[in-house]
Amino acid sequence: MTLVAQKKPAFGLPGRIQAPNSKPRSIAVVGLGSGGAAVARELSRERQPNVEIHVLAKSAAGSDAVAAIQAGGGDLQRDLMNADMIFVVARKGDDASLAPVVGRIAHSRNHPVTALYVVPPEAPLTDAEDETLRALRSTAEMLVVVSDESYVPAMIATLAS
Protein backbone atom coordinates (compact mmCIF):
# COMPACT_ATOMS: atom_id res chain seq x y z
CA MET A 1 0.00 0.00 0.00
CA THR A 2 1.38 3.42 -0.87
CA LEU A 3 1.71 6.29 1.57
CA VAL A 4 -0.99 8.22 -0.30
CA ALA A 5 -3.44 5.35 0.06
CA GLN A 6 -2.75 5.13 3.80
CA LYS A 7 -3.62 8.80 4.39
CA LYS A 8 -6.97 8.64 2.56
CA PRO A 9 -9.87 8.56 5.06
CA ALA A 10 -11.42 5.13 5.45
CA PHE A 11 -14.95 6.39 4.83
CA GLY A 12 -14.11 8.85 2.07
CA LEU A 13 -14.54 12.31 3.57
CA PRO A 14 -12.02 14.23 5.66
CA GLY A 15 -13.47 15.18 9.03
CA ARG A 16 -15.93 12.30 8.96
CA ILE A 17 -15.86 10.04 12.00
CA GLN A 18 -13.58 7.15 11.05
CA ALA A 19 -15.10 4.45 13.24
CA PRO A 20 -18.03 2.06 12.96
CA ASN A 21 -21.41 3.29 14.19
CA SER A 22 -21.31 0.81 17.07
CA LYS A 23 -18.67 2.91 18.86
CA PRO A 24 -20.10 5.49 21.30
CA ARG A 25 -19.41 9.05 20.23
CA SER A 26 -17.62 11.66 22.28
CA ILE A 27 -19.64 14.88 22.33
CA ALA A 28 -18.78 18.38 23.50
CA VAL A 29 -21.66 20.74 24.25
CA VAL A 30 -20.95 24.44 24.78
CA GLY A 31 -23.69 26.59 26.31
CA LEU A 32 -23.45 30.21 25.14
CA GLY A 33 -25.00 33.16 26.97
CA SER A 34 -27.23 32.86 30.01
CA GLY A 35 -29.93 30.79 28.28
CA GLY A 36 -27.51 28.42 26.56
CA ALA A 37 -25.63 28.08 29.85
CA ALA A 38 -28.86 27.07 31.61
CA VAL A 39 -29.55 24.41 28.95
CA ALA A 40 -25.97 23.11 29.26
CA ARG A 41 -26.14 23.02 33.08
CA GLU A 42 -29.39 21.06 32.92
CA LEU A 43 -27.75 18.65 30.48
CA SER A 44 -24.77 18.21 32.83
CA ARG A 45 -27.11 17.10 35.64
CA GLU A 46 -28.03 14.06 33.56
CA ARG A 47 -24.37 12.92 33.60
CA GLN A 48 -24.43 11.31 30.20
CA PRO A 49 -21.37 9.21 29.36
CA ASN A 50 -19.07 10.55 26.64
CA VAL A 51 -20.56 14.06 26.91
CA GLU A 52 -18.44 17.01 28.05
CA ILE A 53 -20.32 20.18 28.99
CA HIS A 54 -18.91 23.71 28.93
CA VAL A 55 -20.65 26.90 29.97
CA LEU A 56 -19.62 30.22 28.43
CA ALA A 57 -22.15 32.56 30.00
CA LYS A 58 -19.83 35.56 29.98
CA SER A 59 -19.44 37.72 26.91
CA ALA A 60 -16.19 38.30 25.07
CA ALA A 61 -15.63 41.90 26.09
CA GLY A 62 -13.26 43.45 23.59
CA SER A 63 -10.60 40.95 22.62
CA ASP A 64 -10.66 39.13 25.95
CA ALA A 65 -12.31 35.95 24.65
CA VAL A 66 -9.62 33.82 26.32
CA ALA A 67 -10.50 35.24 29.76
CA ALA A 68 -14.19 34.59 29.16
CA ILE A 69 -13.46 30.99 28.15
CA GLN A 70 -11.17 30.45 31.15
CA ALA A 71 -13.93 31.77 33.42
CA GLY A 72 -16.09 28.90 32.15
CA GLY A 73 -13.73 26.41 33.79
CA GLY A 74 -12.55 23.10 32.42
CA ASP A 75 -10.32 22.65 29.42
CA LEU A 76 -12.46 23.70 26.48
CA GLN A 77 -9.73 23.31 23.87
CA ARG A 78 -8.81 19.78 25.00
CA ASP A 79 -12.43 18.66 25.07
CA LEU A 80 -13.17 20.14 21.65
CA MET A 81 -10.05 18.54 20.19
CA ASN A 82 -11.04 15.12 21.60
CA ALA A 83 -14.74 15.27 20.68
CA ASP A 84 -16.27 13.44 17.74
CA MET A 85 -19.18 15.92 17.63
CA ILE A 86 -19.35 19.54 18.77
CA PHE A 87 -22.54 21.42 19.61
CA VAL A 88 -23.12 25.00 20.70
CA VAL A 89 -26.47 25.87 22.25
CA ALA A 90 -28.04 29.28 22.81
CA ARG A 91 -31.48 30.72 23.43
CA LYS A 92 -32.95 33.62 21.49
CA GLY A 93 -31.39 36.84 22.79
CA ASP A 94 -28.26 35.21 24.27
CA ASP A 95 -24.82 36.71 23.82
CA ALA A 96 -23.24 34.20 21.44
CA SER A 97 -20.13 36.29 20.73
CA LEU A 98 -17.88 33.39 21.79
CA ALA A 99 -19.34 31.08 19.13
CA PRO A 100 -16.63 31.98 16.58
CA VAL A 101 -13.91 31.07 19.12
CA VAL A 102 -15.49 27.64 19.61
CA GLY A 103 -15.77 27.33 15.83
CA ARG A 104 -12.10 28.14 15.24
CA ILE A 105 -10.99 25.47 17.70
CA ALA A 106 -13.33 22.90 16.15
CA HIS A 107 -12.45 23.77 12.58
CA SER A 108 -8.71 23.56 13.32
CA ARG A 109 -9.35 19.83 13.73
CA ASN A 110 -11.73 19.63 10.75
CA HIS A 111 -14.69 19.10 13.05
CA PRO A 112 -18.03 20.55 12.02
CA VAL A 113 -20.05 22.51 14.55
CA THR A 114 -23.79 22.08 15.03
CA ALA A 115 -25.66 25.01 16.58
CA LEU A 116 -28.82 24.42 18.58
CA TYR A 117 -30.91 27.60 18.70
CA VAL A 118 -33.77 27.53 21.21
CA VAL A 119 -36.60 29.87 20.21
CA PRO A 120 -39.76 29.56 22.32
CA PRO A 121 -42.98 29.38 20.30
CA GLU A 122 -44.25 32.55 21.97
CA ALA A 123 -41.16 34.55 20.90
CA PRO A 124 -42.09 37.31 18.47
CA LEU A 125 -41.12 36.53 14.90
CA THR A 126 -39.51 39.29 12.89
CA ASP A 127 -37.93 39.51 9.48
CA ALA A 128 -34.76 40.86 11.03
CA GLU A 129 -32.09 38.35 11.95
CA ASP A 130 -31.09 38.73 15.60
CA GLU A 131 -27.47 38.87 16.79
CA THR A 132 -27.60 35.43 18.42
CA LEU A 133 -28.73 33.80 15.20
CA ARG A 134 -26.13 35.73 13.21
CA ALA A 135 -23.30 34.53 15.50
CA LEU A 136 -24.49 30.92 15.36
CA ARG A 137 -24.84 30.97 11.57
CA SER A 138 -21.31 32.32 11.17
CA THR A 139 -19.90 29.43 13.21
CA ALA A 140 -21.96 26.34 12.47
CA GLU A 141 -22.21 24.08 9.47
CA MET A 142 -25.64 22.99 10.66
CA LEU A 143 -28.22 25.06 12.52
CA VAL A 144 -31.06 23.32 14.35
CA VAL A 145 -33.86 25.60 15.57
CA VAL A 146 -35.94 24.09 18.37
CA SER A 147 -38.93 25.49 20.23
CA ASP A 148 -38.54 23.30 23.29
CA GLU A 149 -35.20 22.95 25.06
CA SER A 150 -36.17 19.49 26.35
CA TYR A 151 -35.28 18.30 22.83
CA VAL A 152 -31.58 19.03 23.46
CA PRO A 153 -30.84 16.34 26.12
CA ALA A 154 -32.82 13.73 24.18
CA MET A 155 -30.92 14.46 20.98
CA ILE A 156 -27.50 14.45 22.69
CA ALA A 157 -28.29 11.18 24.51
CA THR A 158 -29.30 9.51 21.26
CA LEU A 159 -26.21 10.69 19.41
CA ALA A 160 -23.85 9.71 22.25
CA SER A 161 -25.15 6.17 22.52
Report the location of each language-model feature.
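Glycine-rich, small/polar surface segments that engage phosphate groups of diverse ligands
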Residues: P20-A71
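Short, glycine-rich nucleotide/cofactor-binding loops
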Residues: M85-S97
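Glycine-rich oxoanion-binding loops at beta->alpha junctions
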Residues: L56-M85, S147-Y151
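Short glycine/serine/threonine-rich phosphate/pyrophosphate-binding segments
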Residues: G36-A40, D94-V101
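A short helix->loop->beta-strand "cap" motif at the edges of active sites that frequently abuts
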Residues: A106-V113
